[in-house]
Amino acid sequence: MDLSYETAPAGVTEVSAATLDSIKELDHVKNAALYRTRQASNAVYYLNTALSGGNITGVDDGYFDTASYVVMKGRGFSKNDYANARRVALIDESVESSLFSGESALGKTVEIQGYPFTVVGVVTEKDSYDLVINSMDDYYMYAHDDSQGNVFVPSGTWPVIFGYDEPQNLLLKADSTDTMATEGKAAEEILNSNLNVTD
């Protein structure tokens, strides 16, 4: 299958490297990453077993550090994986348990939307933290449910699999939970000021 693709279609705004760098330079931001995600309902298969739920996430090279994931088994994505949009995937422990029933997932092929991807690693979250939630806006900003599991692919493969239906998301790692909301708002202002919107 051909995994080449055109650039983003007209009207789809991508976050530039310069904009991401500006966000990373905020006083209390330790790291930032871009990603796209969608629910994986019946989109991921291993042989005849479907992942029922969970998320598929296309990630950049800063995502795993920013999201505090570590590789437990196998390897993470390499520069070559990102540069060449290689069909490789990382999964979390929940997906390994659901799809592989106690077998090692390493080197096995899963299908994502009909495209074959080789599982090169299994990841887990390394940090837990207590969020400071002061409003409903803060709650919705931080709310997510990873209980069904996560499948990760290099960001370059995302448009081939899913097109540009999902917007880019920004993930920030602040230096403390006390600064998360203020740095999130500052990043929002930078993103909005760099939108190229025309009528």
Question: What kind of feature is each model-predicted range?
Answer:
Residues 1-43, 144-145, 168:
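Membrane-proximal extracellular/periplasmic loop immediately following the first transmembrane helix
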Residues 4-14, 28, 45-52, 122-126, ...:
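Structural beta->alpha junctions
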Residues 16, 20, 57, 180, ...:
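A general structural signal for well-ordered alpha-helical segments in protein cores
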Residues 43-48, 113-115:
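Short strand-coil-strand connectors
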Residues 62-76, 87-196:
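Mid-to-C-terminal secondary-structure elements
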Residues 80-81:
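Soluble mature domains adjacent to a membrane tether on cell-surface and organelle-surface proteins
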